[in-house]
C-alpha cells in the first residue's frame, strides 16, 4: 500500500476487499475505500461465486495519481473481479502515476483477476506493482493487458515510460518476479519488438493436463483466427505464464479468454459465460 498521507498532486485512492465463503456463497464481507476507487455491489451469475466490478477514477489516471488495490479471498471462497472498461493512463508533464495491487488467496480459495486493458497514452509515465500471494491449495487465474499508444488511431507510444513488476508467492516463497520497463525509444529492448500490445496471464496450479489443454487451445485459436500474435508459455514451480504480443486488444483478449474458459472447464467442469460487462 501507499502512504495515504503522502503528498500528491493527483488522486490518492485505496480500496480493500475481503471475500468469505458463507453457506456455500462467496460474500464480500469487508470493504474499505478512500478516494475514487470503488466497486459495484457483487452479483452471482454462477454456482455461488462472487462477481465484482472494480471502478477506477472517472476520466482515467493522470500524473501524480496514487492507486492501491488490495484483495483477500478467504478459505474456500471464489471471486471473479473485472473492470467495466479500459483503464487509461494519460500524458505526464513530470510526475508519475502509480498503481499497486496486492492480491491474497487463502487455502482452497479461487481468485479470477480479469481486468480489461491498461492504455498508456503517449508521454504517459507510470509505475505498476502487483504482488500475488497464494497457498499451495489456492487457484488463481489473472491477466494484465497493456496497450502502448492507440494503435486503432495510428497513434504510437513515441514518448513516455512505463515500469511494471509482478511478484507471485506460494506459501510465502517467491516463485516468479516479472519485470517490465518500456521506454518509448527502446521498444525492442523491452521485449515488445515494436508490437503495441502486451498480454501476460498467470495460472496456478498448472498440471500437465492443464498445460496440454492450454497449448492446444492456443494452437486452435491461432489456426482459426489467423491472428498475428506472438505467444510463449513458461512453467515455473507449477505456475503457468502465458505471454502474448499483438497489435490489438481484441486479438490478445480473445486468446486469453479462450485459455480462461479452458482452465475453468478442467477445474470446475463447465465453461463459464463471459462477464456481461465485456460485451458493452
From Swiss-Prot:
InterPro entries: UreD
Keyword Cytoplasm among record annotations: yes
Keywords: Chaperone, Cytoplasm, Nickel insertion
A Pfam short name: UreD
Molecular function (Gene Ontology), one example: nickel cation binding
Disulphide bonds in the chain: none
Record's subcellular location: Cytoplasm
A single GO cellular-component term on record: cytoplasm
UniProt cross-references to PANTHER family, sorted A to Z: UREASE ACCESSORY PROTEIN D (PTHR33643:SF1)
Subunit structure: UreD, UreF and UreG form a complex that acts as a GTP-hydrolysis-dependent molecular chaperone, activating the urease apoprotein by helping to assemble the nickel containing metallocenter of UreC. The UreE protein probably delivers the nickel.
Family to which the UniProt record says this protein belongs: Belongs to the UreD family.
Function: Required for maturation of urease via the functional incorporation of the urease nickel metallocenter.
The protein, known as: Urease accessory protein UreD
Amino acid at each position: 500500500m501507499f502512504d495515504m498521507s503522502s503528498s500528491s498532486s493527483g488522486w490518492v485512492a485505496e480500496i480493500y476487499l475481503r471475500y468469505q465463503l458463507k453457506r456455500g456463497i462467496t460474500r464480500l464481507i469487508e470493504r474499505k475505500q478512500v478516494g475514487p476507487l470503488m466497486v459495484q455491489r457483487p452479483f452471482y451469475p454462477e454456482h455461488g461465486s462472487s462477481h465484482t466490478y472494480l471502478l477506477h477514477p472517472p476520466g482515467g489516471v493522470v500524473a501524480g495519481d496514487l492507486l492501491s488495490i488490495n484483495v483477500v479471498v478467504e478459505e474456500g471462497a471464489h471471486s471473479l473481479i473485472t473492470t467495466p472498461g479500459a483503464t487509461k493512463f494519460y500524458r505526464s508533464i513530470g510526475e508519475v502515476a502509480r498503481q499497486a495491487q496486492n492480491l491474497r488467496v487463502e487455502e482452497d480459495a479461487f481468485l479470477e483477476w480479469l481486468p480489461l486493458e491498461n492504455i498508456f497514452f503517449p508521454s504517459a509515465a507510470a509505475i505498476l506493482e502487483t504482488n500475488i500471494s497464494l497457498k499451495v491449495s489456492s487457484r488463481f487465474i489473472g491477466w494484465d493487458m497493456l496497450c502502448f499508444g492507440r494503435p486503432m488511431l495510428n497513434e504510437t507510444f513515441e514518448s513516455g515510460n512505463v515500469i511494471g513488476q509482478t511478484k507471485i508467492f506460494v506459501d510465502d516463497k517467491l516463485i516468479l518476479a516479472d519485470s517490465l520497463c518500456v521506454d518509448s525509444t527502446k521498444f525492442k529492448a523491452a521485449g515488445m519488438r515494436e508490437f503495441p500490445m502486451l498480454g501476460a496471464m498467470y495460472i496456478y496450479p498448472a498440471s500437465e493436463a492443464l498445460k496440454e489443454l492450454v497449448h492446444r487451445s492456443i494452437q486452435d485459436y491461432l489456426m482459426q483466427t489467423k491472428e498475428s500474435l506472438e505467444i510463449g508459455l513458461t512453467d515455473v514451480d507449477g505456475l503457468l505464464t502465458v505471454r502474448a504480443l499483438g497489435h490489438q486488444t481484441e486479438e490478445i483478449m480473445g486468446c486469453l479468454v479462450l485459455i480462461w474458459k479452458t482452465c475453468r472447464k478442467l477445474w470446475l467442469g463447465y465453461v463459464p459465460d463471459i462477464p456481461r460487462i465485456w460485451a458493452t
